[in-house]
Amino acid sequence: MRTIYLIRHGKPEFPDEQKYCIGRTDLPLSEEGRTQIRALGETFAGRRIEKIYTSPLKRCRESAAILQEVIDRSIPIEVMDGLAEIDMGEWDGHSFDEIREQFPAEYAARGADMYDFRPPQGESFADCARRARTTWNELRMKSRGDILVIGHAGWFRTLICGWEKRKKAELLQIPFGYGQVYEKKDFVFDALISAAGRSSRMGDFKPLMKLGTQTVLEREIQTLRACGVHEITIITGRRAEDIRAAAVGTGIHFIHNPAYAETKMFDSVCLGLSYYKEKRKTAGKETLDGIFFFPVDVPLFTPFTLEYEKYRFAEGDGDVYLPEYEKTPGHPLLIRADVIEKLLQHDGTMGLKGACEQPEIRRIPLDVPDPGCAFDADTQEEFQKLRDWERKRPIPDREECERLLAWFHTPEATVRHSRAVAELTVELADRVLKHRSETYVEMTYKSPPIDKHKIYAAALLHDIAKAYPEHPETGAGWLRLLGHTGIADIVADHMDLPEEKLGYLNESLIVYLADKQVQGERRVTIEERFAAKREKFKDNPEALAGVERRYQLAKRAEALL
């Protein structure tokens, strides 16, 4: 395991003693800031740092240069634009007194919704968080050892807020002073794909068959990359050159099994494991913690399965993690790198399954809510089933929704509420569709299609993460990882509908409104729903203001129906 050090730049040179909004304002370090960073650099003496990544802003680049000079001048520095601080738009460079005076309405709106508020021509913290997650994954995959990341408090806080499962409202409470360090432990995972089979029963070449617009192999590589897998090793056999040509991109390694026609899959697996054994020996054990393994004909596992395996891997209770869907074995396996040598000592009986069942190997079966992990294809008929499932996956059916509610241990009261909301969404949708048919409304962006199956599924799962902080976005995140992309945004919107979706009838608005009209399992009016909350927060002016804001939004949505 390696450590990634998040380091806030030193104190900048401010124009005066006022408090300024300096998101992208390019201030240099102050003398105090340079002293802070130099002292920090001394604490890294003797540590092996592979690389320094820095924001393009001057205060960070200067901090990075000082750290390089103090720690080791041979450490490379890379500037990443994605590390830049949150863009405060027209507010940038102004004092907060000036902002309050020039933008009174916007400043008040910011106070009511700090996380999602977007200053004129700028970013919200939600925008910054999305950019931060993308950049974080990029920089993680650029290196394998300990690294320094020099950046900004706002950018770092959006990541830490998610890592520590904090509420959005707590974002600015996360301490991150000038020159402060946050240590993030990080496992390094690679992947091994066995693509040396002959595809004899398929009558085609499985790695290069199309699933939608992508080949099987392209889909698998995309999923691995989305989960921060570093190097992908592909064992080739038949049509090796075609696979090399198709698997484009950095961090892809090929090992050819010249005897693929006479050997079994375990022989190909051993070629890959032997490669990783030698790699750890030369580069150091800390450069590789685990290996995802799967045969190339299992392309529909989702990022959720990989992330869940990584989560369980971090608990340290197993050596091989084996996903399964409703008792059906699936892929990828996650193999702890420390047991590579033991697996290689196996005599080959029962292949990799037999190697993993050695008594010294701790096997951990993992039930996952991902049918795709258990779908493989050896014939054209089986491959067509993969295509059918891939087409249907964005919108889960009722049976799959109920399975998800059970897997995530959603409380029974919440499940009953969700079913009641789902039934109401269908009634509201029928009302909208009936009105459209009677008035011959043309489909436009202001009157988009209403899919009853989609809103029913979204309503059934809207509170799937109710027991977790920021449950709308948490639940939507789970659904995106599972490939249920058709309903994820609706789930994310169900508590606070974005302003841009309040001007016309749409699927998010219908689910949002149905949720506001069901209390427990009982249907209520908007007024009834908010009366209890007004009473609850009557002595808390700030919370009461939030209740009133949500009430007004709900009434605007109701007026559209």
Where are these regions (language model features)?
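Domain-level recognition of soluble alpha/beta enzyme cores
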Residues: 166-186
